[in-house]
From Swiss-Prot:
Superkingdom of origin: Bacteria
A GO MF term: alpha-amylase inhibitor activity
Entry annotated with the keyword Disulfide bond: yes
InterPro entries recorded: A-amylase_inhib, A-amylase_inhib_sf
Annotated protein name in UniProt: Alpha-amylase inhibitor Paim-1
Xref: Pfam families: A_amylase_inhib
Length: 73
């Protein structure tokens, strides 16, 4: 399993989208880990970035559980 993203990366969920905000000093690459065990695609966020990282809770996988760090390439 991948390790959780640092606390400075904040996840917001709505019915339609799951969004991540990078409040860290460094660029991070994260994906959404859903409660059903599925993982979304990786998204790279520079410091201060806010981006959609997955579907919301009405999507195929339901509620997101947490943001996970993606392996660095």
């Amino acid at each position: 399993a991948s390790e959780p993203a640092p606390a400075c990366v904040v996840m917001y969920e709505s019915w339609r989208y799951t969004t991540a905000a990078n409040n860290c000093a460094d660029t991070v690459s994260v994906s959404v880990a859903y409660q059903d065990g599925a993982t979304g695609p990786c998204a790279t966020l520079p410091p201060g970035a806010v981006t959609t990282v997955g579907e919301g809770y009405l999507g195929e996988h339901g509620h997101p559980d947490h943001l996970a760090l993606c392996p660095s390439s």
